[in-house]
Regions:
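C-terminal regulatory/interaction module of P-loop NTP-utilizing enzymes
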Residues: 1-196
Length: 196
């Protein structure tokens, strides 16, 4: 069983889960006078963005700090980082197969490069919004819909960002595609809009 976005759970619900987290834990359904005991192979997982600490950054509004007693019942806590560049590129191409050409693969690789830059910028405090693999996928899909990579980028990511950070974002874009998003859209030799 996977509790997705576990730290967004309501505290009254979280206490019901606490008993299940115990070794050989069980769930009691009082209204049905029933006790549910898990199969020996049963495993419980949870995903969070805050590692149970609540929204300390302002990025995950609606999350709750998880009770320390409940956190203590989780035997293993793992932090997952972003995918490798090649893995993320392969996933985007598998989801948007129109990009599975030489030019398309180069285009997606540059998109992922920009996403990597945004993540580094976020870590360094230059950006307050990070580009997730989901955003890169939206950008690729919107590039096909609008037949315009630059517009698709603005609609998929840049418009979500603080305007005071647009200069940094425009610089990242120029590095990856050779296009100044604030100009008339004329490209340098590095970039081109994807054309099927």
């Amino acid at each position: 069983l996977v509790f997705d976005e576990y730290d967004a759970g309501r505290p009254d619900v979280m206490f019901v889960i606490q008993r299940v987290l115990e070794t050989e834990g069980q769930l009691t359904l009082l209204d049905q006078n029933m006790v549910i005991r898990p199969h020996p192979a049963f495993r419980l997982f949870a995903t969070t963005n805050t590692v149970g600490l609540g929204d300390t950054s302002g990025l995950y509004h609606g999350t709750q700090q998880i009770n320390q007693g409940q956190m203590d019942r989780w035997n293993i806590v793992v932090t997952l980082n972003y995918l490798s560049h090649d893995d993320e590129t392969a996933i985007i191409i598998s989801k948007v197969p129109d990009f599975d050409t030489k030019q398309g693969r180069e285009e997606v690789s540059a998109m992922v490069n920009l996403a990597d830059m945004s993540r580094e910028g976020f870590i360094n405090g230059d950006l307050s919004t990070v580009m997730s693999p989901r955003t890169v996928l939206s950008w690729a899909q919107n590039t096909l819909i609008f037949d315009d990579r630059d517009l698709a980028f603005k609609l998929s990511f840049m418009n979500k960002c603080d305007e005071t950070e647009h200069g940094v974002i425009v610089e990242y874009y120029q590095r990856c595609f050779g296009v100044d998003l604030l100009s008339d859209g004329t490209e340098t030799s590095q970039g081109s809009n994807f054309a099927g």
